[in-house]
């Protein structure tokens, strides 16, 4: 069995979008810890291939890859937790949908990082 890919719909909770963007921009700035967080999450078996904001107030759609052996429940717990895209703040509602790659003859949305 291979990695599982998910599309995650992130909806901002009422009045929380601005706080999230401020936190995200700070994290992605030089010295903000973004690269370290990506490395730690990858080590845990979670990798975000892309984040795609529709508007500044949401939603944001992300493509995540999850290492083999990690359940959907464990992924949801990660996404909702302190290491997930909400930065440990109560700002996002995260709807995680696994992508059935068998429907597209095994094609994945991105080249897998876990083999």
Can you say where each PLM-predicted feature lies in the sequence?
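A common structural junction motif
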Residues: 80-90
């Amino acid at each position: 069995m291979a990695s599982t890919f998910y599309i995650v719909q992130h909806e901002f909770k009422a009045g929380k979008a601005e706080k999230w963007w401020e936190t995200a921009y700070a994290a992605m700035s030089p010295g903000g810890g973004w690269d370290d967080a990506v490395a730690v999450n990858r080590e845990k078996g979670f990798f975000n291939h892309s984040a795609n904001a529709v508007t500044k107030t949401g939603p944001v759609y992300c493509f995540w890859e999850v290492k083999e052996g990690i359940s959907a429940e464990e992924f949801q717990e990660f996404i909702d937790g302190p290491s997930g895209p909400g930065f440990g703040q109560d700002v996002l509602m995260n709807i995680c949908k696994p992508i059935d790659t068998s429907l597209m003859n095994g094609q994945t949305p991105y080249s897998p990082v876990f083999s």
